[in-house]
């Protein structure tokens, strides 16, 4: 009886520890990044993506993204401890030590590099490693504590997944892949600044120079509106370039107009609740936009003239 209880207790501790390590990888953010990478894989070929590339490539990108987020948690552990939104993270509470986090990140990164080398190609491996450095070092260490434009300048690393997926299949990164990167790059500021606005009290504690803290609410709202317009323009590039048809065009315009409606309402009559709804919609927006792009890829509709 004692042995069984001890065994159950050990299993419970292991499960808790596994959840804590998983939390370091920011699973929700990683899922969206890998989803966009997988869409990039399918858009790179008119047929089916080879299963080995699909599974091995996606896993490799997932692991390297998780490694980058773990380093982010490590670097920002003291900042996270000050913020209500992030104080629970195991790096902030000290439940997982600095050494353990470094080892965990190294294992994830090494495994991800190996998977991409074996199941994708070296171009994808090195591009993903460069993305890891861009997020973990350039954004987290250099840009985020230095400038309120951190999310704009550092947004390239977060926008890379479609190009990584594309290169995993084709071994190249053509203009079409960069259109997808540009969409996410222009989507990132209004997405993140909506969060920063309704969490501005938290960010004020952190000491980080976030735009709502350094330039105020009104300035940030204007930038959300302007970047939303730029983002909508960027989403039209796949249609203009001929890589998508009318199914995507209609969806891109419809989804974009809803996003613009949120941005305009925020600018006219701000509330934390509306900013939170805008942030949540932005995640749904990107997911639906890329999903429709995939549907359009296989069922492209272009009316005959």
Curated annotation (Swiss-Prot):
Q: Which reaction does it catalyse?
A: heme b + (2E,6E)-farnesyl diphosphate + H2O = Fe(II)-heme o + diphosphate
The cysteines joined by S-S bonds are: none
Tell me if Amino-acid biosynthesis is a UniProt keyword of this record. no
* InterPro entries for the chain: Protohaem_IX_farnesylTrfase, UbiA_prenyltransferase, UbiA_prenylTrfase_CS, UbiA_sf
Sorted UniProt keywords: Cell inner membrane, Cell membrane, Heme biosynthesis, Membrane, Transferase, Transmembrane, Transmembrane helix
What the record says about family reads: Belongs to the UbiA prenyltransferase family. Protoheme IX farnesyltransferase subfamily.
> Could you tell me what this protein is called?
Protoheme IX farnesyltransferase
Q: Which organism is it from?
A: Cupriavidus metallidurans (strain ATCC 43123 / DSM 2839 / NBRC 102507 / CH34)
The primary gene name is ctaB
């Amino acid at each position: 009886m004692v042995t069984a209880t001890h065994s159950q207790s050990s299993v419970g501790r292991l499960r808790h520890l596994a959840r804590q390590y998983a939390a370091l990888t920011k699973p929700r953010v990683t899922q969206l990044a890998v989803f966009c990478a997988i869409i990039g894989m399918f858009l790179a070929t008119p047929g089916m993506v080879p299963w080995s590339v699909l599974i091995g490539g996606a896993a490799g990108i997932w692991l390297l993204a998780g490694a980058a987020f773990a380093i982010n948690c490590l670097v920002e552990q003291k900042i996270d401890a000050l913020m209500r939104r992030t104080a629970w993270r195991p790096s902030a509470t000290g439940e997982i030590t600095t050494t353990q986090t470094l080892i965990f990140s190294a294992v994830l990164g090494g495994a991800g590099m190996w998977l991409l080398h074996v199941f994708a190609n070296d171009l994808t491996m090195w591009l993903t490693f460069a993305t890891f450095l861009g997020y973990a070092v350039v954004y987290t260490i250099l840009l985020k504590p230095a400038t309120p434009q951190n999310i704009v300048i550092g947004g390239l690393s977060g926008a890379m997944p479609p190009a990584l997926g594309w290169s995993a299949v084709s071994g190249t990164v053509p203009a079409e892949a960069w259109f997808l990167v540009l969409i996410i790059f222009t989507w990132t500021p209004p997405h993140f600044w909506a969060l920063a606005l309704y969490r501005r009290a938290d960010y004020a504690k952190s000491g980080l120079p976030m735009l709502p803290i350094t330039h105020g609410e009104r300035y940030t709202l204007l930038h959300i509106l302007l970047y939303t317009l730029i983002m909508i323009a960027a989403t039209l590039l796949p249609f203009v370039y001929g890589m998508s048809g009318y199914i995507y065009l209609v969806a891109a315009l419809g989804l974009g107009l809803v996003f613009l409606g949120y941005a305009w309402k925020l600018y006219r009559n701000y509330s934390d609740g509306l900013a939170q709804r805008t942030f949540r919609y932005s995640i749904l927006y990107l997911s639906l936009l890329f999903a429709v792009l995939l549907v359009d890829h296989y069922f492209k509709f272009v009316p005959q003239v």
